[in-house]
Every structure is written in C-alpha cells, then in structure tokens.
Amino acid sequence: MHPKSRYLLILLLALACRPLVAQERVELEQLYQPILERPLGVAPAISDSAWEQLIQKALDAPETTVTLQTKAQESLEMRIDKARLRCTISVSGLLTYELLRAPWRTQGERPILQITTLEQPYRVSQLTAFLPKQEKQWELDATIPYTDWLIHSEEKELVPSPSEALLAPLTEMPVVLTFTTEQGRRKVRISATPSLEGWTTKEETKRIKQLISISPQSYQLTRRGILKRIK
C-alpha cells in the first residue's frame, strides 16, 4: 500500500474511533441521566468510583461494550444502546442488569425505567416502577422508540410511528414476569391495561399456554408492584 494511502486509512480509522464530540456527549448524558445515576438496586456491590469510571468509558464509546477491572477483581462490562435508550451492565458475567427507559413519563415526575436483573444460571425478571400512575396525566416522548413497549396486535403487526402514538393514548404495554412452574422458572410476557379498578393484566395465551395454562388468566398489578390473580 502506498505510504500516503496508508496514512489516510489510519487517519480515517482514528476519526471513526474517536470519542464523541462534546455536544453529542452532553445530549447522550441528558437522555441517559436516570440510568447513569444508578437506580436503587442496580449493581449495589460496585463502588461509586468504579461506577463512574465505567460510565465515562461507556459514554465515550456508545454502541460498544466497554470493560473495567476493579480492585476487588470484578470484571465489569457496560454497553449503551443509543437507538433503544437501553443500558446493559454485567458483573463478572454472572449478574446482568438491563435498564430500559420508557417512552412515557408522568407529568412532573422523573422518567420511568424498566429494570431487569438476570442472574446465572437462573433468569430473574424484576419489574421496577415503570407503570405510570392512573390519576396523573402521561407525557409521551416522540424521541424514544416504541418498538419494545407497544403490543403487536394480530390484525396490525406494524408499530405506530411516534407521531401516531402521540395522537392516541397508550392503552397497552408489555410486562415481563418470571413464574415458577413444574418445568422450572419461565419468563412470561403479559399485556397491561389501565382500568377503573387499577392496573390489570391479561396473559397472552399464545405465548404461555404450554407453560402454565391453556386459558388466559387475569391479574391485578397493585401500585406497590405486587401481582395478584383475579379469581
């Protein structure tokens, strides 16, 4: 390869791998602020200094898995997904936290997060305060993708665009829970809908009929996050 061509190639690679410019980084920090502040219960064993180092590395290289070795010999990994407003943190490959920002928030309150904890060799899903309170007005954010949150109906497989979603009230959202069955722990996807009695859920039969029951079962999700079956 010609020396000049080699130099240009190295320069292009350096530009492609450079950290985000200041403005892009500030915007990324603003979007991820609720996640970067480390919500209660997320990686409590990690020191504040290690968390801060991990965050800085992840912000410098979004869409890339960054690593950090702590003094306690813990291997930490973090990945920021810009497109989905999602952050994944792994502790020594045994414990993984997935934080996903919801595309809605309650007026006057902080953005809502869904936190899922995956522990090897078992998968444990934690639903953490992402259902908005019924008596307050919701605010939908057109900048956050709706793909992970809106339920696909059998008649219409396409997810509404953000502009369409802003025009119509959000009436359904997915909730992932873990049930203990005879076959072991199984992750179950249910759809939650607001009602006058509070938040109720109805399992999607096609997803779980082989695991729990052929007929759908109804549940009520209380404000404290407790799931109760409606008999």
Language-model segments: which ranges?
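Short aromatic loop motif centered on NTY/YTY
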Residues: 140-223, 228-231
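Short, surface-exposed coil-to-beta transition loops
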Residues: 94-96, 112, 122-127, 172-174, ...
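A general "mature secreted/periplasmic domain" signal
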Residues: 115-116, 126-133, 137-142
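Short beta-strand elements that form the blades of beta-propeller/WD-repeat-like
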Residues: 110-118, 186-192
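Terminal domain-start segments
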Residues: 23-102
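Bacterial N-terminal signal peptides
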Residues: 9-16
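Sec/Tat signal peptide C-region and signal peptidase I cleavage site
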Residues: 18-22
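Bacterial N-terminal signal peptides that target proteins for export
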Residues: 1-8
